[in-house]
C-alpha cells in the first residue's frame, strides 16, 4: 500500500503516475475531492485513490503538502516518508519527528485548481537510491525518475530556482517569463541565484548545474506559468517564503554569508502577507 498526503499539484502528479502503474494509493487530503481530474495535453483522467489514512500496511508515504504544514502530517506517516516539497526546512522538520524519511525533488510543472490538475511542463523526479522500489513504480507509470546517491545538491539547485523566480513573480504578479523579458527582474533573479550558490558552497554542497544558468533556462521553459508563490499572493494565501528565500537568509546568517537580495525579497513577501492578514 502507498499513501499520498496532499492532493495538490505534486500529490496529484504522483497519484497519476501510480495509477498508470496499476497502483491505487490511499490519499489523505484536507479539501476532499470525490473526483479529481489530471490532464495531460487536454486528455483528462479521473484519478483513482482510496480516501483515508487508516491502513497499516503502508510501504511508502509520499508527503506533498505545503512546507509550512510539515509538522501536521507526522501522525499520518507510515513506512518510508518521501517528502516532496518546495524549499529547505520542511523535510528537516519531518525528519526530526519521523526519522524514517527521505527528501524528493520534483521539477515537473503542474497547475492545480480545485479538483483538477494540469501538467504544464515535463521535468524529473529525483529520489535517493534507497527508495528504488518507488522509483520503479513511478517509471512504470511514465514518470521520468532519477535515482541519486546524494540528493542535497538537487534540493539546493531547486531552491536557487524557486528563490530567484517565485518572490519576484509574486511581487510583480507576472508569469515566469518576466525574468527573461525584464532586465530589472532578471538582474534581481540572478543576484538571488548567486547568493544561494554562495550559501551552498559554504555548506559544502556542489550543485549539479550552474544555478544562474538554470534560473534562465527554467524561466524561459516555463515563461507562461505563474509560480505557486505568485498564485498564493494573488489569493492572499499563506506562502512558503520562509522555506525558500527565508531559508537562504537563515543559512546565510548561520554561515556568515551575505544574502541581501534574498532578505529584501523575503521581507517584501512577508509584508504583503501582513497586509492580507490585516484585512
From Swiss-Prot:
Main location (coarse class): cytoplasm
Question: A GO molecular-function term, please?
Answer: 2-dehydropantoate 2-reductase activity
Q: Which sites bind NADP(+)?
A: 6-11, 66, 86, 240
Subcellular location per UniProt equals:
Cytoplasm
According to UniProt, the reaction catalysed is: (R)-pantoate + NAD(+) = 2-dehydropantoate + NADH + H(+); (R)-pantoate + NADP(+) = 2-dehydropantoate + NADPH + H(+)
Gene Ontology CC: cytoplasm
The signal peptide here is: none
InterPro entries this protein is in? Answer: 6-PGluconate_DH-like_C_sf, 6PGD_dom2, ApbA, Ketopantoate_reductase, KPA_reductase, KPR_N, NAD(P)-bd_dom_sf
Supply the EC number(s): 1.1.1.169
Q: Which residues bind substrate?
A: 158, 162, 166, 176, 225-228
Q: What class of enzyme is it?
A: oxidoreductase
Similarity remark: Belongs to the ketopantoate reductase family.
Read off the PANTHER family from this record. 2-DEHYDROPANTOATE 2-REDUCTASE (PTHR43765:SF2), 2-DEHYDROPANTOATE 2-REDUCTASE-RELATED (PTHR43765)
Q: What does this protein do?
A: Catalyzes the NAD(P)H-dependent reduction of ketopantoate into pantoic acid.
- Its recorded name reads 2-dehydropantoate 2-reductase
Amino acid at each position: 500500500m502507498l499513501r499520498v498526503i496532499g492532493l495538490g499539484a505534486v500529490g496529484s502528479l504522483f497519484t497519476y503516475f501510480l495509477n498508470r502503474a496499476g497502483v491505487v494509493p490511499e490519499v489523505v487530503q484536507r479539501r476532499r475531492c470525490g473526483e479529481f481530474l489530471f490532464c495531460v495535453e487536454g486528455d483528462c483522467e479521473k484519478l483513482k485513490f482510496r480516501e483515508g489514512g487508516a491502513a497499516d500496511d503502508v510501504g511508502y508515504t509520499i508527503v506533498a503538502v505545503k512546507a509550512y504544514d510539515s509538522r501536521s502530517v507526522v501522525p499520518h506517516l507510515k513506512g518510508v516518508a518521501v517528502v516532496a516539497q518546495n524549499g529547505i526546512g520542511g523535510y528537516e522538520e519531518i525528519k526530526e519527528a519521523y526519522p524514517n524519511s527521505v527528501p524528493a525533488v520534483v521539477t515537473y510543472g503542474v497547475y492545480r485548481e480545485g479538483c483538477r490538475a494540469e501538467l504544464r511542463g515535463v521535468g524529473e523526479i529525483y529520489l535517493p537510491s534507497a527508495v528504488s522500489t518507488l522509483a520503479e513504480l513511478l517509471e512504470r507509470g511514465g514518470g521520468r525518475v532519477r535515482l541519486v546517491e546524494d540528493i542535497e545538491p538537487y534540493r539546493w539547485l531547486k531552491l536557487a530556482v524557486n528563490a530567484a523566480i517565485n518572490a519576484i513573480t509574486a511581487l510583480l504578479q507576472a508569469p515566469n517569463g518576466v525574468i527573461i523579458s525584464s532586465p530589472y527582474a532578471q538582474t534581481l533573479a540572478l543576484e538571488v541565484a548567486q547568493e544561494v550558490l554562495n550559501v551552498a558552497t559554504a555548506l559544502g554542497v556542489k550543485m549539479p548545474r550552474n544555478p544562474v544558468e538554470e534560473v534562465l533556462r527554467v524561466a524561459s521553459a516555463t515563461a507562461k506559468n505563474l509560480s505557486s508563490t505568485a498564485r498564493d499572493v494573488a489569493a492572499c494565501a499563506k506562502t512558503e517564503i520562509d522555506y525558500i528565500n527565508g531559508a537562504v537568509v537563515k543559512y546565510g546568517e548561520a554561515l556568515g554569508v551575505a544574502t541581501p537580495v534574498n532578505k529584501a525579497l523575503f521581507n517584501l513577501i512577508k509584508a504583503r502577507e501582513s497586509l492580507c492578514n490585516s484585512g
